[in-house]
């Protein structure tokens, strides 16, 4: 990402699966922006899907994605990755740049966006359960997009991406990370 419209792959989310990461089978198209809700249905938003993520949770799928000007959290009806999909109330999820999901050991889900904003999600995925907080590293800016959190060896690791100069499209596009003992 970061290369503008020429780098966006289209208006669909497609899935492949593999048991050993060598041989892949095409599952199919699981989302098409023609399904996009009225609040996000501008002509430009229907053209592109940006940074989709899929997560499995208690017998259903969760998906976050970014059309051009909005972001969305969707949940499946059940175990079929092809859906049907339902959008969470858009007020809480609208306008979150490059959203990502993280599930903590206690089952709590968090929405991360803009690389350093995080908020707990309500248990029914109907919105945010808390006001967002910023999780910055102590000594520098970590970036502006491409965020994700993993728990590794008991530490929370926030990954992010940004241009090395902290100026868009100048320098190299780098991966950054920082660690913490708690998620917020």
Region roles according to the model:
Residues 1-184:
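Carbohydrate-active catalytic/glycan-binding domains of CAZyme proteins
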């Amino acid at each position: 990402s970061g290369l503008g419209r020429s780098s966006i792959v289209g208006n669909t989310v497609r899935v492949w699966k593999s048991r050993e990461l060598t041989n892949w089978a095409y599952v199919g198209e699981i989302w098409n922006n023609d399904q996009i809700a009225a609040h996000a249905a501008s002509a430009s938003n229907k053209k592109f899907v940006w940074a989709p993520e899929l997560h499995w949770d208690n017998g259903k799928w969760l998906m976050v994605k970014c059309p051009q000007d909005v972001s969305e959290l969707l949940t499946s009806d059940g175990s079929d990755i092809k859906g049907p999909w339902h959008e969470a109330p858009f007020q809480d999820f609208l306008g979150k740049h490059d959203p990502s999901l993280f599930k903590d050991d206690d089952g709590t889900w968090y929405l991360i966006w803009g690389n350093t904003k995080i908020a707990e999600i309500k248990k029914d995925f109907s919105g945010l359960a808390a006001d967002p907080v910023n999780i910055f590293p102590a000594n520098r800016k970590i970036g502006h997009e491409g965020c994700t959190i993993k728990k590794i060896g008991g530490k929370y690791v926030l990954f992010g991406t940004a241009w090395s100069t902290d100026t868009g499209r100048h320098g190299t596009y780098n991966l950054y990370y920082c660690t913490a003992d708690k998620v917020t």
